[in-house]
């Protein structure tokens, strides 16, 4: 999907780029697969802010996505490619032979009318989902489960792909987009191919208002706050931080590694991601 530029008729138009939505085939979602989505503005169930800089934005409907891909042996035909406001990738509506409809994350190269399949017997073809033990090494994959049957958790955003490197014992070595090499149980499922909407990384938001449409609020620097609000705050006029950079809660920031060394999944990481 290519990006579209505009003539600089105003400062807000000058750098904006948008997707041309060439792959999208319909504008309305499948009603049976849509749910209401209530805005949280970064708050948890206690009403406390757990994610800063969230709030407002355009109203959205949630599209129920099939991340488990557990409809084994039933062929499905791609009916539409659709825009999803809740993720960077596009989604595809699949009509299965038994009459059921499901949304999946649309891989790059998936076309309307194409047939896809799930299960150990599926072919190594873009859009098909198989356990890692049935996928040959070297193949690009996405939508990977961390635990068998729990649904895809990693490599789901636009343009993302991982590579199955090798199989050893009960685990597969997978190189993730970050460069990290991690072990996944061989019974975990993955989808063949790269996530679609590859040009998403080239999109420039271009103006503050467009960020607000997406529900992103401004990020205020700690150094311009008062001491009561941030460890970097205070001082007369423009003053340096005066200490190693920290988060608003006093934890080391800007490059300091914060992963817990005792985390159980650390033993599954063969090689850490590159900086």
Curated annotation (Swiss-Prot):
Query: What GO terms are given for molecular function?
Result: rRNA binding; structural constituent of ribosome; transferase activity
- One Pfam family, please name it: Ribosomal_L2
Segments of skewed composition (Basic residues)? 258-275
> What's any GO biological process attached to this entry?
cytoplasmic translation
List the keywords (alphabetical): Ribonucleoprotein, Ribosomal protein, RNA-binding, rRNA-binding
Q: Which GO terms describe its cellular component?
A: large ribosomal subunit
Q: Does the keyword Transit peptide apply?
A: no
Where do the record's region annotations for Disordered lie?
225-275
Q: Which SUPFAM superfamilies match?
A: Nucleic acid-binding proteins, Translation proteins SH3-like domain
The record, for HAMAP family, names:
Ribosomal_uL2_B
- Its quaternary structure? Part of the 50S ribosomal subunit. Forms a bridge to the 30S subunit in the 70S ribosome.
Q: What does this protein do?
A: One of the primary rRNA binding proteins. Required for association of the 30S and 50S subunits to form the 70S ribosome, for tRNA binding and peptide bond formation. It has been suggested to have peptidyltransferase activity; this is somewhat controversial. Makes several contacts with the 16S rRNA in the 70S ribosome.
Family, per the entry? Belongs to the universal ribosomal protein uL2 family.
Q: What is this protein called?
A: Large ribosomal subunit protein uL2
What is the organism of origin for this protein? Desulforudis audaxviator (strain MP104C)
